[in-house]
């Protein structure tokens, strides 16, 4: 039997698998001719972009609920090796699987430098498990002796994830530490750049800065973290901040599986792909999501985001089947780009274009953000094969 292996079950991986199943149906390929298999280290599709939120109950979807109805198999294991010449992947269990075509969609991870104490005492919201660990840690602090350090969180990295995390935390801390003991919850956002939201542009920056003020978030810019301890952080300036919680949100890098391929990668570790999501220089391999640097238009490459990962997955899934059956491949182009950043109780900010011009802010932008986070980025959850495959069509959604 011919086999398509998809590595990863995040936004790109899920939609690549469903996109492949949809295209097989569309071509009326007889059942049992092509096996579509997802290999990932968890039996879940995680809504990773919501990990900064206080309520994580809707952030994890059993893969069986969305792959099963589509006839897509799933293997719960971490892929440890890719043999591109032999067209075979090996997993942490020792099992190996041959493939006729491969879609690499193993995502990205937060970069944690070798700072003293970071690995031992730092937290993150990079994964669902990491977000749960942070949640449990904060709940544990709230049940213990109430000190200023216990009620203080330092967030490192003032990019999008760091800003959303910092803006969400004041509400969480006030709910957890509302015991009337005279201790005021404190959130401090740190970044080595001279200002927060360095990638958000001049239009959005004042909105973000005001939101941080409104949320009571302190900032330290132009400094970096030198060391982390159970009691806080030491900054490059020499300042020490007493805090029982340090959340690391600084920097992302593509899955280490990209390092196994004999081709060039960009500064984020991403593979170069062509307009059809084929990995340039590696036969029979496609890539989608955070592991791939795909051209969105004549000037811009894809951004590590579900905004780009989902359509990249859909197109890769369609094209991997087209490639198997000598059908024309579909070029992916996304003619627009938006950013909708959650600012906690201050609402949100919505920007359009690569220059990130603000078009909405406050409560209206918050409504859009909530719609994205709770509906737009989810697969159909009604168990309908028809609905799942229809949602996997190779198309680009309109602006939210």
From Swiss-Prot:
Pfam families: Pyr_redox_2 (PF07992)
The keyword ATP-binding belongs to this UniProt entry's keyword annotation: no
Induction of synthesis: A member of the dormancy regulon. Induced in response to reduced oxygen tension (hypoxia) and low levels of nitric oxide (NO).
Keyword Oxidoreductase: yes
Keyword entries, A-Z: FAD, Flavoprotein, Oxidoreductase
Cofactor note: Binds 1 FAD per subunit.
Molecular function terms, GO-annotated: NAD(P)H dehydrogenase (quinone) activity
InterPro entries associated with the record: FAD/NAD-bd_sf, FAD/NAD-binding_dom, NADH-Q_oxidoreductase
Enzyme Commission number(s) of this protein: 1.6.-.-
Any GO BP annotation: aerobic electron transport chain
Cofactor(s) needed for function: FAD
Superkingdom assignment: Bacteria
Family: Belongs to the NADH dehydrogenase family.
Classification via PANTHER family: 64 KDA MITOCHONDRIAL NADH DEHYDROGENASE (EUROFUNG) (PTHR42913:SF3), APOPTOSIS-INDUCING FACTOR 1 (PTHR42913)
Name of this chain's protein: NADH dehydrogenase-like protein MT1860
Originating species: Mycobacterium tuberculosis (strain CDC 1551 / Oshkosh)
